[in-house]
């Protein structure tokens, strides 16, 4: 097994990278007080790299830095709250912060502030890890529009699908599509699927998932007349075409298959 903790630890290749990582992590964790910033930075710098990465993921308690001294106005408020830096429990869902697309990677811009720290770990893996540092990056985490991995599905060597969802914006899909199609990875088309914008349809893969080359699970409340758009490069320019066909027919055509099976699941199925 390969764990995220291992990959990040391997990416901290020297003390300079470690300090860069700590500073960026603390800024994104919302540590604004300069004295507290330096105390926590020193705490992390003196830890073994693996232990530091684990602590960053599990959150930093006030008791961890061993001081009850009140150095700022904020120290007098919310004194019962145990954490200085909150844990990152959603790291469990590793398909959201970054997505492998062919031999490239999308380091995603998360929709909610709560989850944005997660992609920092991916940034350092694909910037410094000896094995993965040369991986083509197809989307950067600091883009102003959001995209999450649960909306990105690789359907074949030439086609990917991306959900336009509550968490993934059309502007982000255009950026990703342009980078993917202009790269030498081999993809030729991006299928953008407009799904309902609600928590129960949070990502494309919660309601539509490929389980075989010609079989897909689909939530029964997903209509077959969803708005589907095909994005491709024509004469080096991004071309977007709306399909006036059912999702099933679009998949058959774009994946060059004679038959597509949609397996209803969830709800009363």
Each language-model region and where it sits:
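The feature marks the mature, well-folded catalytic cores of soluble enzymes
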Residues: 1-269
